[in-house]
Structure formats: structure tokens, C-alpha cells
């Protein structure tokens, strides 16, 4: 398997020429990088105008590998070929490197670039990508891969420190600004040489005077740019550290790769970085597992309109009076603090009075509010806060709370929260746990993720008041009064729900299962091999607009739009509707006896849609009549004589016989439609989760006129 690395954008608040002078101090040897033993120049070229300088070097590295492995391989050192291309005119440096040793067995490719910051020409940006592909290595492929990745990630951080070291060395020598390239400079021109020879000192003095005080003052200058939320599709390292926390190089790379994939497949609208990071953490930064989990969650949010819950959900009066939970300041780490007096909650009464769905909606609104508070606290405290603390008081917990339907509802709610709000719980403090608690814990703990269970701290009796108690995590000033503190906690006291508020038997039966929003506009369907799913759309007026919005939940499909001269037989669909199977049934409308181009025609070019993609589009009809939306399984051989690697892997995994999708379509009358066709947006939005990117390299929105 090919291992890939993508760095965030690292910003130096120094001009490009000064950063280049620091970079070139690494050659031919660099004591600050022990594994780098030296380099020899193989080729060198300078353009006549001095704008371009190309150097190709052979670099000698001492890889920290077991001596036995080195002996088997028969090498003591590893050699790389590095080609550096400096363009002084454009102020860019491109570094291309690949391994020379064992190039037939191991392929290592690295590309780095230095360039001027797009918003400040006195700053310099650095980016880095690399790939590792081990074809064979004497049966030690896995070992070599681990060693190589360990060495590489260790040197990433070291490389930044080396640049900072040499920048500080230059500043200590009084070199804080170097001249830029200008037409007419002597052949072999170099900024540092020009500075030292005094060729352009007068120009530099004029430039410094026009720019005001020097930005590179050693006493007050920082090597890192002030972090800001990125306005482009690229993440900056300082932004990650400021808003997302300390990540290892490979964790940063996983975040960037998953974010790029979402940008390409979700039409420029993607979850916020902190939410993507939560799913990566939940899957130990395994990008494929995190991608699958995140896509399922995004589809769930869209289908049940969870993004709008804070705007639309109003807790019933019963919850406001008898649900003993609420937000209460923050803990010592700045995390939002939620307090739940579970022992005072009449779980049976709430379920009987409201049903499971209302309780689930309330729990979801709490989680959405928690994410919002984390963002606010991040800005308030100046450090990344992406989880909250929950303090659960079990005083009053008894066998009444082990009511079987209530426990079942709790377990289902836990499953929903674990799947869609991973890594949001920073710490769970359980206080005054009674003797009955182990019984409840035995029932609940198997449904809680192992990472979440490790964050639980359980106190029985009054142990929470002693050393190691809640005072270690919550300031004494905000410890609730019912736990012996001085702070008044404004949450309901709970208590028994009056039976007069219970639902009738009919209402209780309707609330027997968690359904969330039954009025969801999305439908689900499966696509089988040889059995596409098709929808008939009847258009009464020409120039009407057919819009669609669908998500591919499993497998790859081909989406097409047809205009039919014949009316399809809809009896199969009517039978499915009568059987109540419409949401997930597969309906085929185009008769096998029909001929494409005679009985029906294609008006929308086939679009291959990959698993996890979110597709939105539109079509302006030229004629009234019957239109058919079709989703059929994508064959790896379609349109190509060579099968894609992804398709082969999918078939080997046994998932190639069934696809699943979630879709919505609508017809807009021509007089009701306003705006550009390509501006049609999905019917869902990530009101709490999303950030909109400026560009998307792959847009699935279309606006075609029938021909």
C-alpha cells in the first residue's frame, strides 16, 4: 500500500529571499540534522539574467535501521537525488527528491515548495508532499515501511526547526532584509552575495525607508504567522495549532487528505475542520474508516434535518420542568460543563409522557449546543476546545431507573450519539453512585466506545469532595450547591412526572420506536446488479426545471436522465407503494423491449457517482412529457478497457452486488425559478457543522437544455 503525506501550509513571517538564505545554509552538510551526512553537487545551471538557479545534488543519509536489516540489504547509507529550482523572479523554490538506493524495490518521492504568501509578500509559505511505495524488500516490507515513516515524520519537525535556527543566525549577524531580483542584475546574482558586496545597498535603503520599520526585528519578531481561519482550501500549520490542537505530522496529513476528499465530493460545502478531526480521532486517524463513519453521519444529518434542530426544536413543557439537566459554566480546562441530575429524572415518566423521539431530539439539541459552546470557548480562552465535560449526579438512582423500556431507549440514544458525535465528551464525572449503579453500568457500558469509557471518573458516596475529587476538574466557585458548593445551579430539579401527562395508548404506540423526523424529504433505495432504480417525472410545461439531490451511501452508481416517448408501466411501483415498501424498494420503469434513441432518449450525460459523494444538479426541459431519473450500478469496465484499482478492490470486498442511495427531487415551474441553474443548492445545509470552501475541484451541478 502506498503511504502518502501532505503537510499543512507553514508560514514564516520573513521575506522569501531571507528564508532562502537560511535554507541554503543546510548544504553541503548540516550538523542540526544528524541523519544528513552530506551532499555533492551533480549539476548546476544559472540563467543569464540571474532569475533561475537549478542545482541537482546527491544526498547521503544515515537511516536509523536495525543493523541486521542493513546487513541483509548490504548497505550502510542511503542516497537520494534532490533537484532544487529557485526562481528569483517569481520568488519560488521547488524541491524534487527521490531515492537512488533500492529504487527498484522502494519508491520514495518528495516535493516541497517555498513561495510568497498570497496575502503578504513579506511572508513565505512552505508546503510538502511525499509518497512511499515498497514493492519488495527481502520479506521485510512491513518493517521497512514502519522505519521509513518513523524517520520521515521525525525529520519533518526537525526541518522547520533548522530553518528557524538559521534565520535567527542570520538576524544575529545583522541580516534582516535581502534585496529582490530585478532585471539587469549581473550573471550569477544571489541576494546574500548582493547584500554583502553592497551592490544594491542604496536600493535597499530606499526600499526600507518606503516600507517603514523593519518587520524582521529579532527582539520582537515571531517565526510563525498569527493564526487565522483559512479563507482558502489550504490549512495553515499555525491555524491547526491554534484552533485544532497539537497534531503529529501524520495526523495533520490525514486531516488534510480527508478534507480534500470532502471538498471534491461534497460540492465545496464540508464540515468544519474540528468536526472532521473528531471522526479521525474516533477511528485512530485511519482515513478510510473515518471517511466511512463521517459520510454515514452526514447522510444521517441530511436525511433527518439535524442541522436545523437548534432553530426548530422547542422542548416540551414536560422536559423543561422535569428533565434535570442543563449547561453550567465551564471546567478548569475551559470545556463547557453540562450537569445532569440523573437520579432525580423520572425516566419512565418522561418516556411515557413524551415518547423516545422527543427525548432523542432533546439529546441531539444538547449535543449541537455543546459543539456551539466549544467554538465560543475556543475563541474566549485562546486555545482549542473541541469537547465538553459532563457531571452526572446519581443521588436518588434506584431500581425505578432500571425500567426495561427506559433502558432500551437509553441504549438506542447512546448508539445514535456515539455514531454521530464522536470524541465530543472530554470527561464524564459521575458522583454519588449508589449500590444499584453497577447493574446499570453493566447494561450500558458495552454500547459505549472504549475511548469514551476511558474518560469516565466514578465517585461513590462523598468521595467526590476529597482529594482527587471534582475540585480537581471544576473550580470551587462553580461547584453546584446541591454538591456542597456555593454556586446556584439553574437547572430543573426533576421529580416524578404526573401520570395525567402520560400519552394515551395510541400515542404511546406511535412513539414506540425512534423515528426522528417522519416528514423527511429524502427517500432511500437500493440498486442491484442488472436492476436499476428509476423514477418517473411528468412535465406539463416546457422549460420546467428538474432538480435532484442525492447521496451515494454504498457502492458506485451511474446517474442518467431520459426523456420517454412512451408511458412506462407503473404497476410495479404502485404495488410497492401498496405494500409500504416505497422508501427502500427498487423500481424499474424502462421496459427491456424499449430501444434507446427510438422509444426514449438520453438528455443528461451519464455521471459516475462514487461511494460517499453528494450530488446536486438540475435540468431545464425543452419539451413536456415523461422524464425518467435512473440510477444503475456502475461496472468497472464501463467506458474503459482497463478496470480502476478502486473497482477491483470493491469487487474483492464483496460489496459490488448492491448499492444504496438517498435521494430527493423536485420540479420547479419556469416562472417560479430565479437565478442561475448552477447555483441550485442542496436542500440540506450544515448550519452547525459546515464551513463553505471557496473552490471545489469537482462540481456535480449541471444545467443542460434538452436537445
Curated annotation (Swiss-Prot):
Transmembrane segments: none annotated. SMART domains: CRAL_TRIO_N, SEC14. Residues 201-232, 686-707 are annotated as: Disordered. Residues 696-707 have a biased composition (Low complexity). Residues 315-491 form the CRAL-TRIO domain. Residues 3-175 form the PRELI/MSF1 domain. Pfam families: CRAL_TRIO, CRAL_TRIO_N, PRELI. InterPro entries: CRAL-TRIO_dom, CRAL-TRIO_dom_sf, CRAL/TRIO_N_dom, CRAL/TRIO_N_dom_sf, GOLD_dom, GOLD_dom_sf, PRELI/MSF1_dom, SEC14/CRAL-TRIO_domain. It comes from the Eukaryota. Residues 201-211, 686-695 have a biased composition (Polar residues). Residues 518-667 form the GOLD domain. Gene3D superfamilies: CRAL-TRIO lipid binding domain, GOLD domain. PROSITE patterns: CRAL_TRIO, GOLD, PRELI_MSF1. This is SEC14-like protein 5.
